[in-house]
Regions:
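Positively charged n-region of N-terminal signal peptides that target proteins for export
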Residues: 1-8
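C-terminal motif of bacterial Sec signal peptides marking the signal peptidase cleavage site
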Residues: 14-17
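Bacterial signal peptide processing site
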Residues: 19-22
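N-terminal low-complexity, Pro/Thr/Ser-rich intrinsically disordered segments
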Residues: 31-61, 66
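Surface-exposed loop/turn elements that mediate protein-protein interactions on large endomembrane-trafficking
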Residues: 44-55, 81-107, 129-147, 170-193, ...
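Repeated scaffold domains used in trafficking and secretory/extracellular systems
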Residues: 57-66, 110-120, 149-159, 193-204, ...
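Eukaryotic tandem repeat interaction scaffolds
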Residues: 254-333, 340
Length: 411
């Protein structure tokens, strides 16, 4: 695995703002179409060229993996009577998968995102109360850089720069971009189309960028009746865009961002990529907007769509992807009987497993470079309820086995 970022996706997406963006979009299917709308670019950035290869901020929400090390921040909430439930501190833990031990690296009074961005020998954690913690992995003094969590959503990094889009985004705001220097906290403008709704991934040297396409320019008006009418005629266009300039290189596919009648609502959630294919979970809702069924779509960069034919009822948990690095390897869901169903990227069932008796958790976070799984097998209540990690052979999991090597907390 590259020494890449595995940043808390949930924290990046749970931001307040006037955007209706995120990893989901209310939509019903439409055939791929070339956009006729012109994309307005933001102000020119200080430097057009990227300072290095672009890397995505991956969907692993609980931890960051670099080589044989796993890093995570865990929030501790007070259990004392006078401050019950109040945030108390965050602890950064490192797990060495070679030695099999987890130990405390750092403690702070700021609440941190769970998974850091890792560049070289430094961990970068966003602080919910403002700023960004830069923590060396090899020792040395921690620094706090100025960063506004309420205003900016990180989307990828290149070199020692973090590229962010504004939390206030299309279609009800004009989307802006910012380049953040991770060495000194300085900022500069970054080119991004003002119609950008969200940027779910990096594909090679391009961004997978979702933008609003409409005859009406953003921002849409606050008037509810007018905005609803506009949304019914708005298209969500997924493109491959230049990460430095925001210029569209290729239109891949489109989905209408409409306000459907009850019974015809489909909500798409981006799961990840594998090669030149993108994977979306499609949630079908009924007249009361309750979930009826869930399926997985594979959409190519040429717009070709394939329903993988693994539709499930609400009795199953949401489909999720098991990634190795930046690529989807498996699709996973679990029924009310507790049995995990595992599928390959073509939609073929390749295995089943069930949580062993006595374990409070048993699920794969990701696939490591060597093909083993990083598992969560429980939580340690004496260490801020931190996850108890284990490594497990992938074939063992696919074949329904339960043999794994658990990490232990160093005292």
């Amino acid at each position: 695995m590259k020494n890449a970022a595995l940043l808390l996706a949930a924290a990046m997406l749970a931001l307040a703002g006037c955007a209706s963006a995120g990893d989901t979009a209310a939509a019903s299917e439409a055939a791929p179409a070339e956009s006729t709308a012109e994309s307005a670019a933001a102000e020119d950035s200080t430097e057009a060229a990227l300072p290095g290869e672009p890397h995505p901020l991956s969907a692993y929400s609980a931890c960051a993996v670099s080589g044989s090390s796993v890093y995570t921040a865990v929030s501790h909430f007070s259990s004392s009577e006078d401050s019950l439930g109040n945030f108390d501190h965050s602890t950064v833990y490192k797990t060495d998968l070679t030695t099999g031990q987890t130990y405390e690296m750092y403690r702070t009074g700021s609440q941190l995102t769970s998974a850091p961005l890792i560049i070289d020998d430094t961990l970068y954690f966003i602080c919910y109360d403002g700023g960004m913690l830069a923590l060396p992995t090899t020792g040395g003094e921690a620094r706090v850089l100025p960063f506004s969590y309420d205003d900016w959503m990180p989307v990828f990094y290149a070199g020692h720069y973090l590229y962010c889009r504004s939390v206030s985004a299309a279609p009800f705001c004009r989307t802006g971009g910012m380049r953040f220097n991770l060495e000194n906290g300085e900022t500069s403008p970054w080119n991004i189309p003002v119609e950008t709704m969200y940027i779910p991934d990096v594909v090679g040297d391009a961004l997978l960028l979702c933008r609003v396409v409409s005859d009406y320019p953003v921002p849409y008006p606050d008037d509810d009746e007018m905005s609803q009418a506009l949304l019914q005629n708005t298209t969500l266009e997924y493109t491959l865009a230049d990460p430095a300039t925001g210029a569209v290189r290729q239109t891949c596919f489109t989905l209408p961002y409409d306000i459907p009648q009850p019974g015809s609502l489909t909500i798409y959630t981006y799961l990840g990529k594998c090669g030149s294919d993108f994977y979306f979970r499609a949630d079908q809702c009924d007249d009361e907007y309750a979930l009826v069924s869930q399926s997985v779509l594979r959409i190519g960069t040429d717009g070709t769509r394939t329903d993988l034919g693994i539709t499930k009822t609400p009795d199953y948990l949401d489909y999720c992807a098991v990634l190795q690095g930046d690529e989807v390897r498996w699709l996973l869901t679990r029924g009310t009987d507790g049995i995990y169903l595992i599928y390959d990227t073509q939609g073929h069932e390749i295995g089943r497993n069930k949580r062993p008796a006595g374990l409070e958790a048993f699920f794969p976070l990701c696939m490591l470079d060597d093909g083993r799984l990083l598992m969560v097998v429980g939580y340690d209540w004496e260490h801020d309820s931190a996850a108890r990690y284990a490594v497990m052979d992938a074939d063992e999991f696919l074949n329904g086995g339960s043999a794994y090597r658990e990490m232990t907390f160093a005292e």
